[in-house]
């Protein structure tokens, strides 16, 4: 990876931010998935941090001609992940894999419940880590949804939340260490991927831009249940649009489904209007609870990173163009503002359907 | 490791337990550090589980001529570990290493506090894992004190306890995975160690056998603070006895200190009667709080495993002897009862000093 190139582009972006208004910095942070800092200074620092990641992905995509991202939403009985690929000249990412697993069923054959005994968690998460490498291609980036450590109401943490935090942390560490130890093996192809936490808040705010808040709507909008349902609804819309709209340049089409996925979604659509995501994945969730939210979230995390990377690529192209620097900076913030409007348009279209 | 040999000895021990009284099974569980089951059936199962571990250690010791155990008490600012070695024909284990580390100081150069950001915990615990392999010999077993997941009074879990649970779990997993991945490297010497959780309750009850409970004493005895102080006091006694009693067969001598340790303990003893364990390790704990309890606990965990292994070896010798089976079984429980009495004598001697 060319460090000089990276330093140059990060420097260009920071110069672009130097004299920008706070609202401009906010929209730039939004379209690349950066934390939105409370001060201009903090906004610039967070923008640089996120660009650091995205620049690595951009250069890997140039090198390999494509980028593969696997995004996970960790849970013991509901572990969901989605894997997508973006080719160099394709406008839309393709869905390669999308699964929900009951970890106790898959790795303990339901013979035991996952206790907090470190020997058991170590064994289970090692097998899960190896499972994520079974299907090719190996991702260039693994993202794991960042778990909250607080129960909504109290400053304490409950057992199930402790368990999923431990699962998230060991998985993150295992993925990094597998690369460190495997790359010590001489004469073998080196593993080269990134592991990164994905913030559920930034994912949610990218896809559900709060409309002008009316007193009643904002309370309802913020309820956890409502936010989950709206994300599931959004993913179903993205799926149906992807199948029904053949032409991949239409603005409301965000992702491609290939092969088996195409038929499954078509079947689910034709069978009944209100299908479940679990139906598409043909999940016989014998635990009875056919939850869709983990599937929706893992899908949206993956799609967010693809969107943030594409937006970042557009920004770097503007900054590498031959036009005057001042014009470039103006074009960058214009691009960001347009992107925000497009997303609002998309959400309105989907909500009005 | 000869599986047949292992199966044979485990079978012999179970036959020995088959017709034993509950009190006999209790003393056998006690001297080998097994969980004390509530029923005879449960006692036998837990005895077998513990013997499985100890048999692996015993065979490794026969093969290598010695056994090295490294025991840890995890904490972010107070990470303590103790490493001991037991040679085949030596009656007492030797202390090879004994440290307390402030993890943020050592691995983050105090530049940042350990947040629960998985990227930071992964980086810190990887460096800690590698650090544990820096000094030779590589242990045959790593034990990590099992952390409680509950705050004493409430059914909830507080942040610091979440952090130390995550530290314990990632460390356990890292140690196991380092071996799995490293052993995939062709033509390199294989890593061969065990990783096991060490139960603080079993350690504490081995060294602080509750005297006949009087109403007042039992409440005081059970207070967490009192139990910690008595363990620190016990370790100081073990240290001073080890130095002052040259002859290693005296019943109150439990461990050998060699080289630099000898002088440090002697200096600490001569300087002032009430020395701190931190003084011996020359820890300038600039955090101001020179806590001794982590040092004491890591020491006692390690010494417990050495004691449980030695007791297990004595039991297997009795069961492998030429005498009548019935007599062997009687001798086993006699040995256990004597061991319990010796420990009570030791504690009384120490407490009366």
UniProtKB/Swiss-Prot annotation, chains A, B:
GO terms for biological process: mitochondrial genome maintenance. Its EC number is 3.1.21.10. It catalyses: Endonucleolytic cleavage at a junction such as a reciprocal single-stranded crossover between two homologous DNA duplexes (Holliday junction). It is found in: Mitochondrion. Its cofactor is Mg(2+). It is an enzyme of class 3 (hydrolase). GO terms for cellular component: mitochondrial inner membrane; mitochondrion. Homodimer. Capable of resolving Holliday junctions. Specific for 4-way junctions. Seems to be important for the maintenance of mitochondrial DNA. Cleaves fixed junctions at the point of strand exchange. Cleaves after 5'-CT-3' sequence. This is Cruciform cutting endonuclease 1, mitochondrial. It comes from Saccharomyces cerevisiae (strain ATCC 204508 / S288c) (Baker's yeast). The gene is CCE1.
